């Protein structure tokens, strides 16, 4: 097990930052070895920009980043190259992946992970008190970068979101009580399927889940002429798999009980985080391989369940 004893009161200097970034990349290796093979492949590498108070540290920057920002190499070892440069922007908090259509941008059609320091993250999100919590948040977002490195995913994402904007699903959930109730019931059926003790019971819960889901999608299409199927499948894959990485990393780090972390598997304001996460857990229990195709076909999770339900 990898261990890092830094906490939010640690003095922030260059050596502290480099140590934190080394730790993040060691955890990335652990995820590759224990959870998702290919995560550390060179062709899947995503530059990481760490925002300190007065400067930025960039891990494995692209040539475009180095051409746009004067940077000094401050650490190099085992495929991890860390550069220091001026602060790239004045946005107070970062914890996300960016990718744009602007040709002059450093993230033109390629993902870049951006994160604030542990200290700034703790100020913005008070629950973040340890480096493990901070690093797990980073890994959730970094996995989004990994997703966009998969062939065809960016194009599929843009096409689907163009037809059904990302805020559509949360709006339906917030504004339509019947929609919200159906989501809650669907998620409960997924949880029951995960906890089922025999295959027949599991299949019965899966069938009930699919019937309820199909009914909700049909109703929303009839009411507003909106087909949410592809958008829902996309967002469950996108956010569900990133939450799955969080879960597996928490478990790897130890001293973790899923039962006590209900936010991971219960429905929040963006329900597809939980339903997507639970779909992956259910396929794990069924022994279904999905890692190799989940980002090339957004129907992967549901298609697998439909095939296994009878």
State what each model feature region is.
Residues 149-228, 232-254, 276:
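Post-HExxH zinc-binding segment in Zn-dependent metallohydrolases
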Residues 12-89, 93:
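Start-of-domain marker
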């Amino acid at each position: 097990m990898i261990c890092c004893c830094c906490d939010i009161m640690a003095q922030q200097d260059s050596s502290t930052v480099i140590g934190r970034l080394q730790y993040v990349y060691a955890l990335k290796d652990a995820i590759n070895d224990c959870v998702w093979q290919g995560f550390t492949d060179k062709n899947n590498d995503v530059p990481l920009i760490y925002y300190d108070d007065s400067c930025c540290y960039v891990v494995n920057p692209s040539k475009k980043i180095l051409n746009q920002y004067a940077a000094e190499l401050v650490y190099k070892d085992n495929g991890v190259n860390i550069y220091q440069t001026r602060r790239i922007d004045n946005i107070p908090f970062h914890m996300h992946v960016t990718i744009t259509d602007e040709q002059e941008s450093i993230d033109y059609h390629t993902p870049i992970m951006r994160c604030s320091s542990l200290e700034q993250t703790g100020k913005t999100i008070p629950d973040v008190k340890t480096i493990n919590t901070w690093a797990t948040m980073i890994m959730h977002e970094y996995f989004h970068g990994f997703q966009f490195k998969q062939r065809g995913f960016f194009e599929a994402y843009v096409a689907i979101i163009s037809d059904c904007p990302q805020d559509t699903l949360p709006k339906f959930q917030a504004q339509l009580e019947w929609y919200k109730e159906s989501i809650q019931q669907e998620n409960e059926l997924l949880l029951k399927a995960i906890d089922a003790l025999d295959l027949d019971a599991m299949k019965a819960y899966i069938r009930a889940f699919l019937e309820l889901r199909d009914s909700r999608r049909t109703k929303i299409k009839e009411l507003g002429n909106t087909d949410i199927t592809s958008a829902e499948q996309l967002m469950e894959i996108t956010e569900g798999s990133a939450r799955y990485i969080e879960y597996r990393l928490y478990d790897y780090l130890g001293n973790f009980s899923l039962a006590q972390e209900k936010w991971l598997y219960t429905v929040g304001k963006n329900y597809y985080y939980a339903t997507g996460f639970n779909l992956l857990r259910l396929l794990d229990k069924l022994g279904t391989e999905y890692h190799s195709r989940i980002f090339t076909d957004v129907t992967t999770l549901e298609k697998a369940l439909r095939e296994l339900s009878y």
